[in-house]
């Protein structure tokens, strides 16, 4: 064998070692003579193809092991594949079938159907080289031939097989049946094997014991099947690549599910992880006892599982069919130290996209370890404070509330060593240094160059290399272009510095980023025994930032390019110095011209003004609230950083921190803090000066600083230890306690992957992506002591334990949220609400109020006034009143309609009294309080027996308790639906009422959702060139969800701060999503956190009031006069008769398309089944459709089985209380039952007994048990009232209805179909319907619009084309029996452009399409669309100039 051939064999053996298969002796006969013939590398596509020369085709298992091993080993470098070239190409059916699953498995990802077909069979082999597979039909055959046949043949070819041909065999009926039987048998066999594998745990307990439905009580660790021996080999999940028989794995359960099968058995499915990967485990129950035992398997358990790994065609992944499952002791880190530390630097998921472990899990861990306290220090925010306080109470921990702030100096100096030197006459020594690193203390200068400039001309030069005495690092060489050869043998640094100091003399020193260059020069001067430079200094970087703040950046190469200054070789001192000199002269002239700066000591006159905070470089500092005053000051600082000093991140100027320092403790934070940086770059003296500002000094474990070493900002671990030792010495010298903190971002080391995925999702925008992330898990006392062992045992304990607890003891116990509700005060609010209520009651019910009216008023007013809620009613009244005066109705949401006082103060139109007649003339009334009538609107028409006037009909029979609770002390939540058009006006009105400093939008916190996290994980998998099992993806997704991603504002929530307090008593303030141009500020805390402490007004935007206003404008009809029992309107909810069309015409058996709450397919089906004829029944429908488990599987079955009728079923939560009181239950118990049922808690035994004792039907009791959530009746009644009014117009004024619907509710149109008539609309509807689930959201929305359009066309109306001179910008216009669409109905034409067209039209006719495009600001695409639709007939393409 030649040397070259031997080398090829050695390369192959090296490859086997690299991929971890060097010890695979089973396949030695296949690998011993194997060679790497060549490696084809495609740099562009990052692929490597290994051409392997082998004696014969590898067994499938060996090929697979090598393929997986190569992909793992080279995942960070390239995508790998093999091309096997065997000397012997002999093949047989067994070999082909062995490879089959490997080759066809990827097809399942592209086509699950074809993948399943191929995976469930084995090909047959026909000589010479044919393989044959079975298909059921032509479609399957065509799909395989067109999409997958070539891939299959090529895959076999890459494995070394000779060129194969592929045939398809169509199964006849008998074969199809046989195939189905085979597939069924295979499935049954799998299930049978799994069931048989669940061996007897022990002899079942004594006879007669129920195997029932409940979880069997555990008397010890969970076990199903046999005990798994402690010494049995456990395989890592990450090492499982293929099907395997009878292996054992172990891990943490992170998801469980039990499914009941049609066979009566249960399927247990759970997911485990050992943090190398994750896997789905399945197990079938053998009997009821197994099924009961399944319920004892819980998320969070550690288990050992024995079973077989197999491909699951349903999940298309490897899963394990379990035979034995044993609970085992989990892997836990323990804190065994006698004296415990306390963590003072910890991040929660509120540190935006940067920390992953929940507050609860971190606090539980601290408590389990025996720590007495813990601090929260999220990045610039306090949003975890409320949750942290609750967790502290739960686990008995003292909570220290802090933030990790971005601290800035108030303006960075442009000039140092100020001197009164005329800038135009001065001589400048412009210099630059190239160094081995960023630390003036630990690194050294390797090139020093400068030029002297006078009057803009270079008059002298200085240039010198310096021998550092050691080889240069690759980073230094790459960055500077300076090599070892260039510096070797050069003068030592003391010689060069002495020459430079003499050369520069007293001239003004100039550098770009002078603090760096001067830091190196002065530190170097000190090292060699020279005096520090006292020269006047100018920093061109800060001068450029001051003069040109709008530039994107102010790097030297950017500025020289901007000003056409030659920079020949950036990062070489001589070239940088020369370019900086010309730049400096340009800047000096601009400073004179722009700001009249003539002298060196005037350069800093503007420091800190205007946007100077944007130019300052932030550094980290930890700020803690020590006292209640400090907590308020912290809230003020957070607000200030978000409102006044936000630039990329919230910033806190040092001067503001000094002003508000009372009650605060300040720590030095992490490697991004100024103390660590000063020590790293400038040395002990600078660090001591910095330390004076702080209360204590932080140091962190060496692994936390690891990225500094990786990026060569710190030379090595020894240099890092030296920095940390020096920081400890600074603490000793200054008397500041030094505390070891963890900079915690997650709980356990295995959680690091979640943070990696989150940081990776942010791309290059996040500086953390520039190096491997450090290990920043929550460390025990033992672990922390070990990290600082290099300081000596005594000193390590001092900083880890003693000083940490010392700082804890400085802090008071604080509460970041209030205990009570603080409502605004309006003088006389109580009297005003009482007087208004009685005045309206007397106006409606007469001078002598009916007893039922007065009793209800007094009951409510006692609660409302007694608990301080009158002001809330008064505010709501003012808001509604203003809207009504301005011409917009207001709909109510939630339970406010349960309050009669709310009705009397005109907050809601819903009257909650029992159904009654009311005479508008003589005020006579007649009440029905026995439950015989569901709604006053359903009473038959009747005249007043006293004066003959037609009675008004009112009352929805809703108890007050559903609004303010049984004791009337629940904080009222008044939700109001304003017109979407009017909502901004209503919001602004709150500022008029309370003042701008006392109203804020309710803040929200947007976290990473599961779908978003899935995208992050998939992108990470792709970019890291990994293949991650499905169960592992699920685990990673779960670990990334819930992390703060952004902030926002509640769509209608307004928080009102009482004027006798200020907002900082409750929460900091910020802009939503950091949008500093936002009109509104929001609460910093999520509004749920302070919901019970301050008044929240829900001023929501809704389409119904907008639609009602448009209908009123079109018709002139006051919506309040519309009858609620119009017969033709009521028919609409059960048939299409009122519309004059047949059900087939509109594909609906009811006429409620487009009616709010009743137009969806789901509710229309309910209407078809229930056929409501009254208002109260419509309220029932509304309640049933909004509840959970109220209709489906509950009321629906009761009505279908004729157990009861629609009026009898439970529709709304209030129905329960009212019905039970009518049945004779005591009112407080009726209330408790209603509350329990509506919250999905079902009934207690005592409740059931009381209901049965009062003859409540059994079906009613069972119905209550099924319910998970219920809708308030007042909400339903308000919705139905609006719906009936809109339905009135649909029946009696159809074009008004359709014009309003398309204007207010529709966003997506197909004008081509709509204009072309009914058949065109139906054809488009069919296209969308045919897509089924594959239809896009836009297409589904369009379908709804087309259903309404189809109905309008069926009723004999039609659509015109968009008319250049008639169309509105944004409203459909009625023209005879047709509608003219607005301009914004044209695809991609927005409302602003539509308004621009109308404005241009008012200034004169359009001369041409070109004129329309220019004056109307219309794109060419829109012009083309309008032209194609015939909207621009007669309009020439371009303006024409006439000569006559």
UniProtKB/Swiss-Prot annotation:
UniProt GO cellular component terms: cytoplasm
Question: Which Gene3D superfamilies does this entry report, sorted A to Z?
Answer: 1.10.150.870, 3.30.1900.20, 6.10.140.1510, Metal-dependent hydrolases, Nucleic acid-binding proteins, PolC, middle finger domain, Ribonuclease H-like superfamily/Ribonuclease H
Matching InterPro entries: DNA_pol3_alpha_NTPase_dom (IPR011708), DNA_pol3_finger (IPR040982), DNA_PolC-like_N_II (IPR024754), DNA_PolC-type_N_I (IPR028112), DnaE2/DnaE/PolC (IPR004805), DNAPol_HHH (IPR029460), DnaQ (IPR006054), Exonuclease_RNaseT/DNA_pol3 (IPR013520)
Gene Ontology biological process terms in this record: DNA-templated DNA replication
* Class of enzymatic activity (EC top level): transferase
Q: Where in the cell is it found?
A: Cytoplasm
Q: EC no.? A: 2.7.7.7
User: Catalyses which reaction?
Assistant: DNA(n) + a 2'-deoxyribonucleoside 5'-triphosphate = DNA(n+1) + diphosphate
Among NCBIfam families, the record links this protein to: dnaq (TIGR00573), polC_Gram_pos (TIGR01405), PRK00448.1 (NF001688)
Q: What does this protein do?
A: Required for replicative DNA synthesis. This DNA polymerase also exhibits 3' to 5' exonuclease activity.
Instruction: Name the family.
Output: Belongs to the DNA polymerase type-C family. PolC subfamily.
Which HAMAP family does the record cross-reference, listed alphabetically?
DNApol_PolC
Q: What is this protein called?
A: DNA polymerase III PolC-type
